[in-house]
From Swiss-Prot:
Family classification: Belongs to the prokaryotic pantothenate kinase family.
Enzyme Commission number(s) of this protein: 2.7.1.33
Tree of life domain: Bacteria
Native source species: Bacillus subtilis (strain 168)
Catalytically driven reaction(s): (R)-pantothenate + ATP = (R)-4'-phosphopantothenate + ADP + H(+)
Protein name per Swiss-Prot or TrEMBL: Pantothenate kinase
Binding-site list for ATP: 96-103
Gene Ontology terms: biological process: coenzyme A biosynthetic process
GO cellular component: cytoplasm
Length: 319
């Protein structure tokens, strides 16, 4: 039987907003409206009500997993007679389409997790920094494939994750500028002795094909994750959010002379919409269906969004 014929929804328990909100229990983490807006992505939506209804229960669930992993590691280290083993961070992966709101989810989780009673140190890394530099992509004639799996320096990303899980004291990741549409040369995000590391990116749940495994057996990014989240929505909604974001960028970031897209600052509304639609159809939509959406059911939890970026349903994997 082909995977597409399987009803993979049965792997998950499904919860609407009302039932999910009840799983927050007695966990209380204060977040102001200003703080919620500060982590909100461009054209995204995050209110205190959304934090309390969706993210507090999620943080409680994540905390259970973090504590369970720490307890398991402690017992395994005793068994192996390594009582003073290096500190190993709990890694959370967050995947989903362009414009679906992954960054907002990642940032609010970082803030909330860091405010748990035991005050864990939480770092956030986006995989954008592991895109090959623009000059290299141009040299390989791959600019139209930017965001597709082959446009990432996967070897460097795997080395970064391997260093984290090996207990290395200090690990650094390259930083990406959405203004210049390129890596920031010589700029790095340093992760030092973190308790939790969040890895956010469109393709982080992708696995090698069977052909890849036969020819070159290897591990992939998701093999380093202790918990994974997929931010989901209907394509029509995601496209609408992408279109709205493109319009906002034209009015803001594109006006900056340093912006890679400065040449598009004077586009009319119709021209901007046509360009956004063209990019969506030629790049983002194919990437969604070829590489991102097929990984949804590899996640431990799915946040399904509806109108206005509000999460309508939460799916939690049973096994």
């Amino acid at each position: 039987m082909k995977n597409k014929e399987l009803n993979l929804h049965t792997l998950y328990t499904q919860h609407n907003r009302e039932s999910w909100s009840g799983f927050g229990g007695h966990l209380s983490i204060a977040v102001s409206e200003e703080e919620a807006k500060a982590v909100e992505g461009l054209n995204d939506y995050l209110s205190v009500e959304e934090v309390e209804t969706i993210y507090i229960p999620l943080v409680r669930l994540l905390h259970l997993h973090v504590k369970s992993a720490a307890e398991r590691n402690k017992h395994v280290n005793v068994f192996l007679k390594h009582p003073h083993s290096a500190k190993i961070p709990f890694i959370i992966g967050i995947a989903g389409s362009v414009a679906v709101g992954k960054s907002t989810t990642a940032r609010i989780l970082q803030k909330l997790l860091s405010r748990l009673p035991d005050r864990p140190k939480v770092s956030l890394i986006t995989t954008d920094g592991f895109l090959f530099p623009t000059a290299e992509l141009k040299k390989k004639n791959m600019m139209s494939r930017k965001g597709f799996p082959e446009s990432y320096d996967v070897k460097a990303l795997l080395e970064f994750l391997n260093d984290l899980k090996s207990g290395k004291d200090s690990v650094k990741a390259p930083v990406y500028s959405h203004l210049t549409y390129d890596r920031e040369e010589g700029v790095f995000e340093v992760v030092e002795q973190a308790d939790i590391v969040i890895i956010e990116g469109i393709n982080v749940l992708q696995s090698p094909t069977l052909e890849d495994d036969r020819e070159n057996p290897r591990i992939f990014v998701s093999d380093f994750f202790d918990f994974s989240i997929y931010v989901d929505a209907e394509e029509s909604r995601i496209f609408t959010w992408y279109l709205e974001r493109f319009r906002l960028l034209r009015e803001t970031a594109f006006q900056n002379p340093d912006s890679y897209f400065h040449k598009f600052k004077d586009l009319s509304d119709q021209e901007a919409d046509e360009m956004a639609a063209s990019i969506w159809e030629s790049v983002n939509r194919p990437n969604l269906y070829e590489n991102i959406l097929p990984t949804k059911f590899r996640s431990d939890l799915i946040l399904r969004k509806g109108d206005g970026h509000k999460v309508e349903e939460v799916l939690v994997r049973r096994v």
